[in-house]
Amino acid sequence: MWEEPPISGTNGSGTIFFSGCSLSCVYCQNADISRGRSGRSVSIDRLAEIMLELQHKGAHNINLVTPTHYIPSLAEAIPMARKMGLTIPIVYNTGSYDNVDALRTLSGLVDIYLPDLKYYNVKTAESYSHAGDYPRIAREAISEMYRQVGAPIFDDEGIMRRGMIVRILLLPGRVAEAKLSLKYLLDTYGDNIYVSLMNQYTPMPGMAPPLNRKVTREEYHELLDYAEKLGLKNGFTQDFGTASESFIPPFDLTGV
């Protein structure tokens, strides 16, 4: 599983995956957990303990992946973990299909937001994730996330302590839409956030065109050229050819 350098650092990010998902992406790479086929129930006390265990192992942060539908539990577990001695940042890693009122309950609890901006167009969102309202909801959610954490703060080792990194996963045949998402982010937030341009899309079996193929080198370079044209300063890119099943983590319940 790839994370941006200020998140993964040298010791890695303490990742906790949550079963289920608020979206139904047809190309989902984590279907085993997103569709409820894998996972183990834990108490709020145990969740707080897991965070402490990850800190003890040297993780730079606690990385909560697809946590949207567990916000009430997290609003209890995070303060509990802090009282038990948790000092590293909390990362909220989300597809951005998040209710703003729910996000507000995490104000002061989350240090770093790591949201996706999957789609700019309603038709794409409906076709690929059965969520035509995604563009509006995601933009509203990202705005609330930024309100909470503001501009980025790093420690002396370059590890992010606070801030937001918005991810744009380039999908095959969707360069124009990725450009629109990137321009929206830069027009709205400028250099106050980081943007991660990702090419790691890995086609799952049975996908129809164009989702049945990887992103081409030309597609990714077109997006990077556009980012340079817009003057993107705070950004991350991936080496080309990173799309593979190595980016799909094994959900073996380790550490639960």
Q: Which stretches of residues belong to each language-model region?
A:
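Non-cysteine beta-strand/loop elements that form the S-adenosyl-L-methionine
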Residues: 107-122, 192-200
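Auxiliary Fe-S-binding modules of radical SAM enzymes
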Residues: 150-256
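Conserved glycine-rich "GG(E/T)P / GGGxP" loop and the immediately following alpha-helix
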Residues: 55-80, 127, 133, 143, ...
